[in-house]
């Protein structure tokens, strides 16, 4: 579990940016345009055997009849994907941030300085009046405590889902 926690610490700022980007994409969602959909359908090749099942033999006519339905489906699928990804990421960040905030003592203060204040190790040394080895020890202690919180959280989720 500590590998997962270390990965979250390492990727925290990137995850925050991705969550904000997804939030804005959802807020400003316009989907693909009619022209983009028609163009993609015009250049697509059918899969499998070619069997003509309608009286329409002209490809542009066929495209004109089905593009709107396909465009709505593509836009709906993409919007659902963005929303699902945002909700997953937001929940992961919510638990991670609350777990970090719940850490007590020097390990919690050091990790919060790293993550939420964006301080470097040198800045943490100066701000907390501690040496580099102490920063390292406090970080490891925070990771160990977070790993326990994640294990407990996971066990509670499993118990809830199985009940």
Label each PLM-derived region with a short phrase:
Residues 1-99, 151-163:
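N-terminal interaction/assembly modules
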Residues 23, 109, 135-136:
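A generic structural signal for ordered secondary structure
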Residues 31, 119-121, 146:
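A short hydrophobic/aromatic micro-motif that marks alpha-helical segments and, especially, helix-coil
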Residues 92, 103-107, 138:
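N-terminal positioning helix adjacent to the helix-turn-helix/winged-helix DNA-binding module
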Residues 102-119:
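Short amphipathic alpha helix immediately N-terminal
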Residues 118-134:
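Helix-turn-helix DNA-binding module
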Residues 129-149:
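DNA-recognition helix of helix-turn-helix
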